Amino acid sequence: VAVAVIDPVAIENKLSTQEFPEILKSTPSIYATKQGGGFGDSRVNVRGFESENVAVMVNGVPMNEMESGKIYWSNWAGLSDVTRSMQVQRGLGAAKVAAPSVGGSINIVTNTTDVKAGGGISYAVGNDGFNKIAFNVSTGLRNGWAISILGAKSWGNGYVQGTEFEAYSYFGNVSKQINDKHMISLTVLGAPQWHNQRNDNLLISEWQKHANKYKFNAVYGFGLNGQRKVAGYNKFHKPQISLNHYWTINEKSSLSTALYVSIGRGGGYRGQGNSTYKNSWYATALDGTLNTQFRAADGTFDYAAIYDLNMKSENGSQMAMSNNINNHEWYGLLSTYTTQLGQYFNVYGGLDLRYYKGTHKAVLVDLYGGDYYVDSESRKNVKAENNALAQDANWKNEKLKVGDVVYRNYDGFVTQEGVFGQVEFNRNALATFIAGSVSNTMYWRYDRFYYDKAHAKSGKADFWSGTVKGGANYNLDEHNNVFANIGFISKAPFFEYAVFLNKENSNELNKDAVNEKIFSVELGYGFRSPVFTANLNLYRTAWMDKSMGASVTFQDSDERGRINMTGVDALHQGVELEVMVKPVRNLELTGMLSLADWRCNSRATGYLYNDQGIPLTKDGVVTTEKSKEHAKVDVDLKDVKVGNSAQTTFAFGANYQVLKGLRLGADYTHWARNYAKFKLQGSDLSKELGKTMKYDTPWKIPSAGSMDVNMSYRFPLGKVWGIISANVNNVLDQE
């Protein structure tokens, strides 16, 4: 298995003020970035696959949000302080859960009974007002009990305009070794935070027009009387509580069970506007240029002009701000049984159960000087056959105040039940395994905005999925080994992208939704010695029936449409090399090279439906399904490069212990062949209905590299130890 393990020393020495995933940026085929630059807004891609296709776990418990598969790292800001190890498997991997991952898995293992007694306090200061204070204390294992506690606070201004943040993190673990057969462990962790964001997607030429360049935030500006305003804002708290039981049944068998719950509360801002101003909150036009409609002379967003517009209006606020609330409740059970059969076989089997409810609504938080807001743009799309209020003119033109609901109010439900198993054979130089899983995922909605109580609950969609994979490793001698893995994955589509015609406003199921299929093959070679280590991996992953779609609007009709594409396929293949050399005592040199070819390789087809699942012509008129008049579009994606992740990366680093306690380090990472992420746009598809649309490879981002340097000094302070560390990230000032 292609695997990397990050230990606490590496995290302490190299992470500094970076986002937690950025500790992985020198790992082959991993692309970690800050995205817009707001606190916790980072993401990590593995072998070209985005976070929804990378399984992220804490102590083996899955963390990916169940409606979209996404990971929001701001929810886990404090994990770096209590991480015992961060295990990253690229490719098929060996994660013991029923739901499969495509790109790989990241498992963060936290402290438990093996933590030594002691504790510490720390303070960190960095650029742009960054501050962090933290403490931790552990009792070690005493009389069968072990307790670990951590608390931290981070705050700062952010290096991007107007991206202030304040974050707390906490971790608590109480473990009890009942006897030599049973141990229980209760873990509580969370990271409440708020932060301002930057979410625009400007062309490089647009960034370069501004004096602040890459610190520029297009939604940062000033309101009446000069008060600072930022349209991008996020606040969230997602505590997780897990109760683990470890049972050593006998010398050959054990049972590990985790019962967990996660309750998320929070959301983020989204601008609202009437028909004239509904797109005015977007800082970037579709062509990547700056939206200048509400732009002050100095380039900042002109909130004062919005106040002026609303206060002069006789019809309430023309533009307003809502908070998109995304609360959830998640309950799960994960249990794994392990036993040894005979001398050479190990068998694993388990159960993975999950229940998830997400509550999604939007409430007004700022009228920007107006007396009220009329949500006519959304309410005009409510159909009388779904909600009797659609015939009530007073409801359609209701004067809404702060706290009232706009544009959406629904619950998303996901349940998953699965089993998994694995058999391993180990004898002499040969180790083999075969593994499989089967799971059923069910989705449904309950809508309170577009549907009345009689029609609020949607039908249920369930998808059976599974995996079959196997592999072998052979040690040629004490230094050399080779391995191979092969696997097939059938994966349920996500609630957010494909199951419903429109996840925000429609209970109609997408008739064309099917499982995504993945076939993957890996080959590897490894060499180990006291002074030199090398790993070489080759992989090829075919991704079939990828979920993709877009919404469509019509100029001469209030009807809204949705096109869900079928037959979207992609191929991810590449080679990875990593080496480590210890040429002299106290000096360690590392290097990495990753060369990839990730591209789409199919022609996809999509038909046009409205939010009620009724087929439409290209003019938005109701027609017969799959008839000649039923509007469709063919999209030729052949050889379009997969974007959002560098397809060529290399890195090298050095770590030298100058003298006892003093260590210096430097790491350089280079990214090339990184293409912009392409996305099907409804405005483009609507122009090509009835035709074949050819997508070209998106813009290739210029190659770039970044060097980070670090230093740490560990010294005695009486009976305790002190550590001073310093980091300079991007020391070469690469833009």
Where are these regions (language model features)?
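Gram-negative outer-membrane beta-barrel transporters
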Residues: 426, 540-542, 563-680
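Surface-exposed extracellular loop regions of Gram-negative outer-membrane beta-barrel proteins
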Residues: 200-202, 442-449, 460, 474-520, ...
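Conserved C-terminal beta-signal and adjacent last beta-strands/turns
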Residues: 189, 227, 484, 519, ...
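Acidic/polar loop-and-plug regions of large Gram-negative outer-membrane beta-barrel proteins
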Residues: 175, 183-246, 269-322, 386-400, ...
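Signature of Gram-negative outer-membrane beta-barrel scaffolds
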Residues: 346-480, 502, 605
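Transmembrane beta-barrel wall of Gram-negative outer-membrane proteins
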Residues: 125-155, 160-198, 240-250, 471
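Short acidic/polar hinge/loop motifs at secondary-structure boundaries
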Residues: 62-90, 109
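Extracytoplasmic beta-strand/coil segments of soluble accessory domains associated
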Residues: 21-62, 78, 84
